[in-house]
């Protein structure tokens, strides 16, 4: 079974491998040992559950045709259980998200849009569910702003969705903001997205966005800044009435 008790099936085996001093499954003399092998291929569901638990039961007949059987021990008597305990293979959960927000197109005058792309990648080893993206937008002076649209789910790699984001897959969201005169006066906008979701144990997993530019010396959790340079100009006309 998996660590949560869900039924599983071995990929192969148990298969007879060898017997000491010629012992076989057909005839196992006292003091002799038979060896069997088996294997299981790890699945994402097993990782999400935290691993696998396994028990083998050996059975045979004595000379009086009575059934003789024994349930397996895990071979580790230091665990406090010296007989008939599951062989447990634990797989530790390492949930993690990586969020990047970039401005894919920008304008410089009132009414122009700033379009954003937000990517959320599952960089851990367990599936993350119920992914959401929250956004914090301010002008360059720190004044609070609100996105014109989004964040809106756009796509997921290999069928990934906000409801279920497997390891290694990425969700893409879009958002936009329409430039105002106040934003131009402030010198631009600063934006941060925070992606959150739940791991299989229902723990919250979150990550604050990086701007996608590691050349700026800040490789993680830095704001996406869109600067709008001030262009001061006057046009004065004087006419004689």
Language-model regions: role of each:
Residues 1-241:
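Exported/extracytosolic protein signature
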């Amino acid at each position: 079974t998996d660590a949560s008790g869900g039924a599983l099936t071995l990929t192969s085996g148990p298969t007879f491998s060898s017997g000491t001093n010629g012992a076989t499954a057909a005839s196992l003399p006292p003091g002799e040992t038979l060896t069997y092998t088996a294997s299981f291929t790890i699945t994402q569901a097993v990782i999400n559950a935290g691993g696998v638990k396994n028990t083998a039961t050996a059975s045979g007949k004595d000379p009086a045709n009575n059934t003789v059987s024994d349930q397996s021990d895990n071979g580790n008597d230091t665990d406090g259980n010296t007989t008939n305990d599951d062989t447990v293979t634990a797989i530790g959960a390492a949930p993690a998200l990586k969020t990047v927000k970039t401005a894919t197109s920008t304008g410089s005058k009132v009414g122009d849009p700033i379009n954003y792309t937000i990517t959320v990648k599952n960089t851990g080893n367990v599936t993350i569910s119920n992914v959401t993206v929250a956004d914090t937008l301010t002008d360059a002076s720190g004044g609070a702003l609100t996105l014109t649209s989004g964040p809106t789910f756009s796509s997921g790699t290999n069928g990934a969705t906000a409801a279920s984001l497997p390891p290694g897959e990425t969700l893409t969201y879009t958002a936009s903001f329409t430039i105002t005169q106040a934003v131009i006066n402030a010198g631009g906008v600063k934006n941060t997205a925070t992606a959150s979701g739940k791991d299989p144990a229902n723990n919250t997993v979150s990550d604050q966005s990086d701007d996608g530019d590691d050349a700026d010396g800040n490789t993680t959790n830095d704001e996406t800044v869109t600067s709008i340079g001030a262009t001061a100009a006057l046009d004065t006309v004087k006419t004689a009435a």
